[in-house]
Regions:
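Buried, small/hydrophobic-residue-enriched core segments of structured protein domains
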Residues: 18, 24-33, 40-221, 234-238, ...
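N-terminal, Lys/Arg-enriched amphipathic/low-complexity engagement segments
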Residues: 1-29
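Short active-site oxyanion
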Residues: 35, 226-227
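Glycine-rich phosphate-binding active-site loops on the catalytic face of alpha/beta enzymes
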Residues: 248-259
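Catalytic cores of alpha/beta
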Residues: 234-248
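Hydrophobic residues within beta-strands of alpha/beta enzymes
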Residues: 137, 200, 228, 250-252
């Protein structure tokens, strides 16, 4: 019902010198009177199955055809990829982190929604969360750590801001020599104030080796419930490989190879 042509639209079409005034007048009064039938979001579809059926006069159906195909083709692509990634994760939470690598802001916005449809548990795209009511989640960036004079200072500032949801990115400099050590200092300070940390994130390096080492360190320090999140150009194949290697990873952030 909101498909219509305003006077600015009509003036532009008139300027093309392709349409007579009768047709311009026809478009001025245009209304979509057809019916659209579609499967529910998240439905499993097979090749050759209709996802959307449009029943309308030909001129109305052709006006909406390109827009519908553009939306469906893109979003089913992302939702299918997300489903593959989530299946590879074997029930672990998968977060969508793809906005920075998306093919433009609209692709990031709607791609994040499609990723949720495909099984992701949350997105770092706050606008997607606002517009579509999907869960949002994320961590701080390397630039946050680099802004401060020291990694420890950066971690403390973040923990002070988010004491009840503190998840620290520990690979800005050196995961084992500084990142996890500084994280534990901050975790102990949080615990002394009555808060428990969420965990840490790894975004580079040998994720299998580093996650196993970090898991041991966290457990030995009294944080067996702290989670390890991994990111860094992940896809379903990488996740399967990491799981086969016994990586101690609890959740996955996927972006570049998703959106």
């Amino acid at each position: 019902n909101n498909l219509s042509f305003n006077e600015h639209d009509l003036d532009y079409l008139r300027s093309l010198n392709l349409f007579d005034e009768d047709f311009i007048g026809f478009l001025r009064d245009f209304k979509f009177t057809g019916d659209i039938y579609a499967v529910e979001d998240g439905s499993v579809m097979f090749p050759g199955e209709p996802i959307i059926v449009v029943k309308a006069p030909l001129y109305q159906a052709q006006l909406v055809e390109t827009a519908i195909l553009s939306i469906v083709n893109f979003m089913t692509l992302i939702a299918t990829k997300a489903s593959r990634v989530c299946n590879a994760a074997g029930g672990d939470p998968v977060l969508e982190f793809g906005l920075r690598r998306a093919q433009g802001p609209e692709a990031g916005l709607y791609g994040a929604k499609a990723a949720i449809i495909g099984g992701c548990t949350g997105t770092s795209n706050v606008l997607t969360g606002k517009m579509f009511g999907v869960p949002v989640a994320g961590t701080h960036a390397h630039s946050w750590v680099q802004k401060f004079d020291s990694e420890l200072e950066a971690f403390r500032a973040y923990a002070q801001t988010y004491p009840d949801s503190c998840l620290l990115l520990i690979d800005t400099y050196n995961v084992l020599e500084s990142g996890i050590k500084n994280a534990l200092i901050v975790f102990d300070e949080l615990r002394a104030k009555g808060f428990e940390p969420i965990g840490v994130r790894l975004d580079s390096g040998d994720l299998t080796y580093l996650s196993k080492e970090v898991r041991k360190i966290l457990d030995d320090a009294g944080y067996p419930n702290a989670k390890i999140t991994a990111s860094n150009d992940l896809d379903e194949y990488t996740i399967i490989s990491l799981k086969q290697e016994g990586a101690a990873i609890d959740s996955w952030g996927v972006g570049t190879k998703l959106i």
